[in-house]
Amino acid sequence: MQIRSAKDLKVYQKAYALAMEIYQLSKSWPAEEKYSLTDQIRRASRSVCSNLREAWAKRRYEAHFISKLTDSDGENSETDTWLDFALDCGYLDSSDHSRLTIECKQVGSMLGSMLKKPTPFLLHNIDLKSQTSDL
Protein backbone atom coordinates (compact mmCIF):
# COMPACT_ATOMS: atom_id res chain seq x y z
CA MET A 1 0.00 0.00 0.00
CA GLN A 2 1.35 3.39 -0.94
CA ILE A 3 1.22 6.00 1.82
CA ARG A 4 -0.35 9.12 0.32
CA SER A 5 -1.47 10.86 3.49
CA ALA A 6 -1.31 10.46 7.24
CA LYS A 7 -4.72 8.80 7.02
CA ASP A 8 -3.05 5.84 5.29
CA LEU A 9 -0.76 5.17 8.26
CA LYS A 10 -1.86 2.30 10.48
CA VAL A 11 -0.95 4.34 13.54
CA TYR A 12 -3.31 7.11 12.41
CA GLN A 13 -6.12 4.64 11.75
CA LYS A 14 -5.63 3.00 15.15
CA ALA A 15 -5.50 6.36 16.96
CA TYR A 16 -8.59 7.59 15.11
CA ALA A 17 -10.55 4.44 15.98
CA LEU A 18 -9.48 4.81 19.62
CA ALA A 19 -10.63 8.46 19.73
CA MET A 20 -13.99 7.52 18.23
CA GLU A 21 -14.47 4.68 20.71
CA ILE A 22 -13.62 7.00 23.60
CA TYR A 23 -16.15 9.49 22.24
CA GLN A 24 -18.88 6.84 22.09
CA LEU A 25 -18.16 5.55 25.60
CA SER A 26 -17.90 9.02 27.11
CA LYS A 27 -21.37 10.02 25.85
CA SER A 28 -22.83 8.17 28.83
CA TRP A 29 -20.63 9.82 31.46
CA PRO A 30 -22.21 12.17 34.01
CA ALA A 31 -23.14 15.69 32.93
CA GLU A 32 -20.94 17.20 35.65
CA GLU A 33 -17.92 15.76 33.81
CA LYS A 34 -18.86 17.43 30.52
CA TYR A 35 -16.34 20.24 30.90
CA SER A 36 -13.68 18.30 32.76
CA LEU A 37 -12.91 14.61 32.33
CA THR A 38 -15.13 14.09 29.28
CA ASP A 39 -13.78 17.17 27.52
CA GLN A 40 -10.17 16.41 28.45
CA ILE A 41 -10.14 12.80 27.28
CA ARG A 42 -11.93 13.65 24.04
CA ARG A 43 -9.51 16.49 23.28
CA ALA A 44 -6.42 14.44 24.13
CA SER A 45 -7.48 11.41 22.10
CA ARG A 46 -8.35 13.57 19.09
CA SER A 47 -5.09 15.49 19.40
CA VAL A 48 -3.13 12.28 18.81
CA CYS A 49 -4.56 12.23 15.29
CA SER A 50 -4.37 15.95 14.63
CA ASN A 51 -0.73 16.15 15.73
CA LEU A 52 0.08 13.14 13.58
CA ARG A 53 -1.50 14.91 10.60
CA GLU A 54 0.55 18.01 11.39
CA ALA A 55 3.71 15.90 11.63
CA TRP A 56 2.95 14.41 8.23
CA ALA A 57 2.49 17.89 6.75
CA LYS A 58 5.84 18.95 8.21
CA ARG A 59 7.88 15.94 7.15
CA ARG A 60 10.04 18.06 4.86
CA TYR A 61 12.00 19.05 7.98
CA GLU A 62 13.04 16.27 10.33
CA ALA A 63 13.07 18.45 13.45
CA HIS A 64 9.51 19.70 12.80
CA PHE A 65 8.33 16.18 12.02
CA ILE A 66 9.82 14.83 15.25
CA SER A 67 8.41 17.73 17.26
CA LYS A 68 4.85 17.06 16.12
CA LEU A 69 5.27 13.29 16.56
CA THR A 70 6.44 14.00 20.10
CA ASP A 71 3.31 16.09 20.67
CA SER A 72 1.19 13.24 19.34
CA ASP A 73 2.92 10.79 21.67
CA GLY A 74 2.36 13.15 24.60
CA GLU A 75 -1.35 13.43 23.82
CA ASN A 76 -1.52 9.64 23.66
CA SER A 77 0.01 9.43 27.14
CA GLU A 78 -2.47 12.02 28.37
CA THR A 79 -5.32 9.95 26.93
CA ASP A 80 -4.03 6.94 28.85
CA THR A 81 -3.98 8.99 32.06
CA TRP A 82 -7.57 10.12 31.56
CA LEU A 83 -8.58 6.49 31.02
CA ASP A 84 -7.20 5.74 34.49
CA PHE A 85 -9.30 8.56 35.96
CA ALA A 86 -12.39 7.30 34.12
CA LEU A 87 -11.86 3.83 35.60
CA ASP A 88 -11.26 5.11 39.13
CA CYS A 89 -14.31 7.40 38.94
CA GLY A 90 -16.46 4.44 37.90
CA TYR A 91 -17.21 5.63 34.38
CA LEU A 92 -15.35 2.79 32.64
CA ASP A 93 -15.48 -0.86 33.56
CA SER A 94 -12.20 -2.72 33.92
CA SER A 95 -12.52 -4.61 30.63
CA ASP A 96 -13.07 -1.41 28.61
CA HIS A 97 -10.25 0.28 30.49
CA SER A 98 -7.89 -2.63 29.84
CA ARG A 99 -8.75 -2.80 26.16
CA LEU A 100 -8.42 0.96 25.62
CA THR A 101 -5.18 1.09 27.59
CA ILE A 102 -3.75 -1.64 25.38
CA GLU A 103 -4.78 0.39 22.31
CA CYS A 104 -3.02 3.45 23.76
CA LYS A 105 0.12 1.43 24.37
CA GLN A 106 0.05 0.11 20.80
CA VAL A 107 -0.36 3.63 19.40
CA GLY A 108 2.49 4.78 21.65
CA SER A 109 4.71 1.97 20.46
CA MET A 110 4.02 2.80 16.82
CA LEU A 111 4.71 6.49 17.41
CA GLY A 112 7.88 5.53 19.27
CA SER A 113 9.07 3.54 16.26
CA MET A 114 8.49 6.54 14.02
CA LEU A 115 10.39 8.77 16.46
CA LYS A 116 13.35 6.40 16.60
CA LYS A 117 13.57 6.07 12.82
CA PRO A 118 11.95 9.10 11.19
CA THR A 119 13.99 9.01 7.97
CA PRO A 120 11.70 6.70 5.97
CA PHE A 121 8.81 9.10 6.53
CA LEU A 122 10.56 12.28 5.46
CA LEU A 123 9.73 13.82 2.09
CA HIS A 124 13.23 13.42 0.70
CA ASN A 125 12.84 9.64 1.03
CA ILE A 126 11.00 8.49 -2.10
CA ASP A 127 10.30 4.86 -1.19
CA LEU A 128 7.70 5.29 1.56
CA LYS A 129 5.75 2.24 0.45
CA SER A 130 8.25 -0.45 1.39
CA GLN A 131 9.45 1.10 4.62
CA THR A 132 6.25 2.21 6.29
CA SER A 133 3.60 -0.39 5.53
CA ASP A 134 3.53 -1.67 9.14
CA LEU A 135 2.73 1.67 10.75
Stretches found by the model and what they are:
Residues 1-135:
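Short, C-terminally biased terminal segments at protein or domain edges
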